[in-house]
Amino acid sequence: MKTYQNHAMTDAEARQALADACKQVETNLPLYTYQCQNHSSVNDIYPGCANNQWTCGFWPGEIWLAYEATGDEKFKTAALIQVDSFADRIARKVEVDHHDMGFLYSPTCVAAWKLVGSETGKNAAIAAADQLLTRYQPSGRFLQAWGTMDDPGNYRYIIDCMLNVPLLYWAAQVTGSDHYREIAAAHTATTLANSFRPDGSTYHTFFMNPDGTPKGGRTCQGYKDDSFWARGQAWGVYGSAIGYTYTHDEKFLDVFRKALEFYLSRLPEDMIPCWDMLFAPESGEPRDSSSAAIVACGLLEAAKYVDETEAAQWRTLARQMLASLAANYAVKPGTLGSGQLLHGTYSKKSPYNTCTPEGVDECVSWGDYFYMEALTRLTKDWELYW
């Protein structure tokens, strides 16, 4: 495994970085208590938006993390206002016909249930898990990402869903219904079998044939089909760590190690990847700070389950990544309307992909959230929202 000599964030530095992040959340409460943040910033400032994007759960997740860190009731009050909005969204089925129920409801409503016993949050999250079940394709044994369920052009799943299926594992725990767990297990088995290449890299999206056999991997937001989209690799790393948390199946740690090894092999010296890891840092291609924050969370989660030698290596890597983020990518606290991390990439167009260009070299809401989550993990024994 590739190692680095970079500075590793100390406990004191983690506490200060988290305090700065909480200050940034506090600064933004007047802007975004009654609305959501757009998926990405514009000139490093987030436009407000209605609760109708797949990314709307990350800002409330930041508020809950700030509440955990400070105990300040203003964060709890603001977070519960958001929970009510998410309960309304799932009740009215507003833009929920896709697979991103975990991204929406784990850091908002599951968090509310775990932290303050919110029945509204619990019930909304269970309803979101039920909605996610409607995306299941039994022939291919996967949760379809996008589009209508009878559209052959969308008969596929994506690596991001590794962070959506934990909602199903949680729902199985709180309801006692094994059906959620069975669907989660089926989808992750399909993902592990097809979405991770032999070298540990990942496909963004993977198409299946109508008879349930694999068809092939394609990109949407990576540079091209056979390149190495950084955020997809990060979802694979963290998702496999959480998969082990819920199942204690060693195959998840095996996949984690291989995906991590590939990720590390493609990092520049400051440990923050380009948006697609096909590119070297001297290429001038934009970085994606959010990928580093996601991987740091995965390292700290997986480190709970291995021997101390390996755990210490993984924790050091996470601390090095976070030190780099805090020193060179973090927003100065108190910057009204901005996020936590600069230099994220949502969706960069290439000659070979199908995405809409948005949020290039900007703050991205999930990067902000996972940066705070990783810092929180360094300051306490944190219970997953996922």
Language-model features: locations:
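Glycan-recognition and catalytic cores of secretory/periplasmic carbohydrate-active enzymes
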Residues: 1-386
